[in-house]
């Protein structure tokens, strides 16, 4: 079993991404805490959007977007594809300043992290962007 083999979408691109829309137009998301880590689930509003979402939401891109919450030394992002649900799971490690009652942050459980991620621009073909406006 290799999780990467369950995500065949990287070979499905047949059109060029020549427009950009915020992730919220393509997906819904929910976040919460796992100790000192935050979990963000991103679910495509349409299965056809998932390849574009996955192409854009690499761990490196999410680290750059969410750098303000990640521990500068130990913070990192892991990503998994969730087969059958047209979704991705992102784990932001060491993002909660200790988490729960140990954290001095305004959002110690990371409940607003999904809303922050939903603003990230996603490159899509123009015909998809036109459907969403």
Where are these regions (language model features)?
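Single conserved hydrophobic/aromatic residue that forms the stacking wall/gate
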Residues: 1-11
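Metallocofactor- and cofactor-centric catalytic cores in central/energy metabolism, strongly enriched
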Residues: 13-133
């Amino acid at each position: 079993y290799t999780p990467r083999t369950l995500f065949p979408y990287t070979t499905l691109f047949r059109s060029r991404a020549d427009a950009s829309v915020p992730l919220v137009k393509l997906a819904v998301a929910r976040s919460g805490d796992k100790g000192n880590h935050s979990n963000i689930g991103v679910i495509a509003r349409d299965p056809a959007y998932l390849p574009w979402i996955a192409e854009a939401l690499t761990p490196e891109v999410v680290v750059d977007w969410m750098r303000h919450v990640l521990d500068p030394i130990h913070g990192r992002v892991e990503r998994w594809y969730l087969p059958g649900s047209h979704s991705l799971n992102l784990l932001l490690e060491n993002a909660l300043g200790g988490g729960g009652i140990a954290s001095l942050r305004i959002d110690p459980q990371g409940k607003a992290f999904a809303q922050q991620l939903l603003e990230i621009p996603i490159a899509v073909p123009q015909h998809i962007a036109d459907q969403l406006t």
